Amino acid sequence: MDTSEPLEEGDRTHEQRPHTRSNPEGAEDREGLPQAGVGSRSEGEGEAAQVDDPLPTTTAVPTNCTPPPTLEFQLKTPRVNCPEKVIICLDLSEEMSTQKLESFNGSKANALNSSQKMIEMFVRTKHKIDKRHEFALVVANNEAMWLSGFTSDPREVCSCLYDLETNVCESFNLEGLFNLIQQRTEFPVTDNVQTIPPPYVVRIILIYSRPASQPALNLTDNMKKMLQCPYFFFDVIYIHNGSEEEELRWKDIFSFFSGLDSKGTSYKYEVSITGPALELHNCMARLLAHPLQRPFQSHAAYSLLEEEEESPESEVTV
């Protein structure tokens, strides 16, 4: 005869409730679970990482969506909405003036005009989210040139945005861009990366359109230090010609940019210049998220429902 006593209510196996509107992300189920340390993230949402010399001079990661890095350990930063210093770098190569993008009304548009419009919408929307955000505008021909200094007034940035012309460019000096930013920008430092929020973060958004030219870059120690900084992010929107003949070439260039992200915290997008302009705008809209609060790019989902398949026509643009 079984004389064992029935289990008390507290001894029963913890049975989690489904994620519902009244129970977001299983909030009530976390009461009995061990809490994470201050400033830590859930698994898969870590921020900066440190490894011994993770950035060789030549880097390549052959993937369109870089997976989270497999590193020995990751530095986790507080998920705070601190001010951003956003440096928007716009490529002015002749490819940007090609009339191949499909605009919203069915006519053809060039990448420069579409980029100018989406940059203005991005700056104005970020300003509405947090008026402490600051923006700077850099244009790139053969060399990078600082066009507008840091300002929290969107009108100052937009006033410099539209009087631009494309040029025939031989190469893109990415090293010169990094040096220019290091000269003009002070990177924040905190006593404890995991628990103390930074006063601000620095982010570059590079809009690049040179299918046959890989940027010239010789990584110096200062550049490696900048790329490994937990408060620095290097987002890229790469506009390529989309031709099958040059597919391997533009994929190599995209892999080059992916390989610069040793922390796995930056976002990289590739867009065909023969596709819809909506796709280009959607990429910029996805960059509205604060870099300290967004997940790894491979973990990001933009559908309202998990089973809903993502389609360009159904996405929301700013």
Swiss-Prot record:
GO CC terms, sorted: BRCA1-A complex; BRISC complex; cytoplasm; nucleus
Keyword DNA damage included in the entry's annotation: yes
Biased composition, class Basic and acidic residues, residue ranges: 9-18
Coiled coil location: none
Keywords, ordered alphabetically: Cell cycle, Cell division, Chromatin regulator, Cytoplasm, DNA damage, DNA repair, Mitosis, Nucleus, Ubl conjugation pathway
Subcellular localization, as worded in the UniProt entry: Cytoplasm; Nucleus
Primary role: Component of the BRCA1-A complex, a complex that specifically recognizes 'Lys-63'-linked ubiquitinated histones H2A and H2AX at DNA lesions sites, leading to target the BRCA1-BARD1 heterodimer to sites of DNA damage at double-strand breaks (DSBs). The BRCA1-A complex also possesses deubiquitinase activity that specifically removes 'Lys-63'-linked ubiquitin on histones H2A and H2AX. In the BRCA1-A complex, it is required for the complex integrity and its localization at DSBs.
Subunit comment: Component of the ARISC complex, at least composed of uimc1/rap80, abraxas1, brcc3/brcc36, BABAM2 and babam1/nba1. Component of the BRCA1-A complex, at least composed of brca1, bard1, uimc1/rap80, abraxas1, brcc3/brcc36, BABAM2 and babam1/nba1. In the BRCA1-A complex, interacts directly with abraxas1 and BABAM2. Component of the BRISC complex, at least composed of abraxas2, brcc3/brcc36, babam2 and babam1/nba1.
Name of the featured protein: BRISC and BRCA1-A complex member 1
Species assigned in the record: Xenopus tropicalis
Name of the gene encoding the protein in the UniProt record: babam1
